[in-house]
Structure formats: C-alpha cells, structure tokens
Amino acid sequence: MEQHTLLQREESPRSPAAPSLRRLGGSRHITHWDPEDLGAWEAGNKGIARRNLLWSVVTVHLGYSVWTLWPVLELLMPQDVYGFSTSDKFLLGTIATLFGAFLRMPYALASAIFGGRNWATFSAIVLLIPAIGTTVLLTHPGLPLWPYLVCAALTGLGGGNFASSMSNANAFYPHRLKGSALGIAGGVGNLGVPAIQLVGLLAIATVGERKPYLVCALYVVLVAIAVIGVSLFMNNVEQHRVQVNRLRPIVSAVLSTRDTWLLSLLYLGTFGSFIGFSFVFGQVLQTNFLACGQSPARATLHAVELAFVGPLLAAVARIYGGRLADRVGGSRLTLIVFVAMTLAAGLLISASTLEGRHVGQHRGATMVGYFVCFVALFVLSGLGNGSVYKMIPTIFEACSRSLDLSEAERRDWSRIISGVVIGFVAAFGALGGVGINMALRESYLSTGSGTDAFWIFMMCYAAAAVLTWKVYDRRTVTDMGMLQAALVRQPASTPAELIGPRTHRTDSPGAASRRNVAAPG
C-alpha cells in the first residue's frame, strides 16, 4: 500500500553519495512538490497526485449532486402536496445556482490558504448541512416558500467545491497533463448531476414520486463517507499555501488582467450552459409532457427518465474535451464548440417556433427536436468546459516566460496565478447558469414558451465564437506584456512578492529530483 508520507532524500554526512530518508510522519503534509520533475514523478509522485485527484473528484462529485438537488426534488414535489408553481421551482434553481457561483471564488482562495486536504475536509463536512436540512424540510409539506429558498441557497455550498478541487488538481499535475487532470476532475465531478437524477429515478421506481426526502437521506450517508476518505488520503502541500497578507496583490493582479475576464466570458458560455440547462432541463421536459396531455405522474416519470441524459453526456464530454485540448489546442477546440452551439441553439429556436405556430400539432416531432437540441448543447458545453480550462494554465504559463524569475519561481508564479484564475473563472461561469434560469423563467411567464430565451442563448454563443477567434485562435499566445504591466503597476504586486519566499531552493535539477521523491510502500 502506498505510504501517505513524503520521503525526501538528503545527503548523508558520512557519505555524500548515500542518501538517507526523512519521513514527515502521519500529518499528511508535503513540504516540497515539483510535478515537472519527470524522474520524481515516475518514482512515486504520480501515485500521490492520482490519490489526491481521486478524492478531490469524490468531493466535487458529491458537491455537484448536493448543488443540483432541487432540479430533481422539484420533479418529485407535486403542486397539490407542496403548493409550488413552475415559476416557484425555477426560482429555487436560480437561488441555488447564484449562491454556488458566489462561493466559488472564496473556495478557491481558501484552498490556497488552509491547504488542499484541510479545506476539502471542511467543505465536505458542510455539505451535510443542506443535505440534512432538505431532508427535514421535505418531510413537512405545506410550509411557505422561504425556508425552501434558504435550503436551496445552502445547497450552493456544493457548487463552491468545484473551484477548490480544480485548483488542487492544477497544483499536483505537470503542465503536460493539466488538460487531462482538469478534464477528469471536472468531468467526473460533473457526473454528480446525472448521478443524483438517476437516484431520483430509482426513488420513483421503488417508492413513488411522493417521497423526495429519501434522495437527500442517501446523500447524507455518502457525504459522511467522503469526509472520512478525504481526511485520511489527501495531502497538504506546504509550498502551495499562500499567506493571507499576500492575497491582495495576487487577487489585484488577477482581476486587472484582461485574460482573466475574457476567459471568464468564454466559461460563462460553456459552463453556464451546462449548469443552467442541468437545472432547467427536467422542468422544461415535464412542462412539455404536461402540455401533451400526460398526467402529472407520467409527465414526472418521463421527465426524470430523460433529464439525466444531457448532464451525463456533458460530463463525459468534458473529460475528452480536456484530452482533446491537450492535442489540438484549447482555443481552437473552444472556437469549434461555440460555432456548433450557435447552430444547435438555432435548431432549438426552430423547434420551439414550430410548436408555437402549431399548438397541439406535431407534438411528437417538437419533443424529439427539443431533446436532440438540448442534448447537443449539453455535449458541446462539456467539450467547451474542458477546452477553456486547458487554456487557463497554458496562457499564464506562457505569460510567465516574460517575467524576470528563475525557472522554479516562474513555475510557482504560474501555478498560483492559474489557481486563483481557475476559481474566479469558475465563479463567473456559474453565473451563466443563473442567467439561463432567469431567462427561461421570464420567457415562460411572458409567452408560455422558451423561444425568447433561446434567441438570447444563440446570440451569446455567436459572440463567444467571435471573441475566441479574434483574441485567441488567431495567435499562438496572448499579449504577454499586458499581464506583466498589471503585476508591476504597484510595488506590492511584483512577481517575486506574489510567490513569496520559497521553502526549498533548488540548486540543480538533480537536487530537485532528490528532494521530490515519494516512495511507494
């Protein structure tokens, strides 16, 4: 079994050629980590990185499931029992998405401050609050809307998990594997959305649609298991932790960089579509099945049977999106994705318009059109999620080459800035889900269909395609000077001050290899 401590080689005072091993005990703390050292990576650090990635994925997977509890529960909450309209249910999804988005930036920073393992343990523990609270709430139908809104906001704690887990994965893996690692972390994490929808389907099949609290009860158990696993098997990397007094210049540098905002806009289009459609897809299907004349029970069953397909394919696509971006380039794949999403949104508008002009006719054809177009948007958004996240470390690694730093300091700078940008981009992107919820809610309230909202989505995808082409796809890297200028505008924001003093200075590649070896047990 792999030991959970880092073994460091130091020169023996009796023989310079004979290394001795120093154990760091059972504290789960690693004092030095260099994923770019190929020898150390193959000698054992790869196993440590994989183990940390595994448990990061577990926490983000369960976080997504808790975050997207309400799209499933809404389908299992008949209006005659709980008294909530379709508009009320859209509002629950909007609140959950909004709070999850706002928590992502502080979660990313907290991981850097407190350590990956420490924060992952805490963030898993707090998932028990919405899981238990929602279980209690659903066993007492007839309550007003506001306590449900509070519980929906608390499920946003699961949305914050993503940013900290992605920052952790970014820190443990070498640049050549970041696309794959981030794709796996994001993709398997995103599988938490279809997973809870399948749990909802299982609940309907076994106990009927009137016991939604059983879904929450299951996740209370799963989260408790995750807390134990994370605390036992994850690591803190001391050199990856950032002192609180250094956060201000880091955040200032990130927010004053044009690439941060442009990447956020691109992720707004990809991840915003994924999480937004995940929240509304089941509700849209249920509304259309009811309009076809199906009973509420059958409409609910059919909606739950189909709603998981889109998020499932999107999560799988994200994994392959990261790998494909490693091969063909993140910007090129992102451009292709947005062009295809524009076309898919146009087809969705056609299906919705056909339904509006021929009310009661062609229902079967329009339902097929709805489903196919939504699934296409899900798959494309998953690919785009992987490609945009590949762009982040690539862009800032390229920017670091224009800075007057040693090779080791340059890697530290790139990792710190990329980690914070990942958190900010994740938060900004999730706001796209809020926009999708609000746009569809208003569209259904005013016109009874989602056509107006679909027009907005198509224009946003087209604008994102143009942005990607003009800024990123037409050149190899971004304007290096812009980031450097942002860093040196104020003395407190110089690169050396951003990364701080290094705990271990490396005198040679051989020294790095000797210090950075983890031995398997």
Residue ranges and their predicted role:
Residues 51-82, 277-282, 436:
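Extracytoplasmic
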Residues 70-75, 257-315, 382-385, 389-390, ...:
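Extracytoplasmic gate region of multi-pass secondary transporters
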Residues 102-145:
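Conserved MFS/SLC helix-loop-helix module at the cytosolic interface between two early adjacent transmembrane helices
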Residues 125-141, 339-363:
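C-terminal ends and interior cores of transmembrane alpha-helices
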Residues 144-160, 359-385:
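Hydrophobic core of transmembrane alpha-helices in multi-pass small-molecule transporters
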Residues 149-188:
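Cytoplasmic helix-loop-helix junction between adjacent transmembrane helices
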Residues 159, 179-204, 422-436:
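Glycine-rich segments within core transmembrane alpha-helices of 12-TM secondary carriers
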Residues 185-235:
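Helix-loop-helix hairpin linking two adjacent transmembrane segments in secondary transporters
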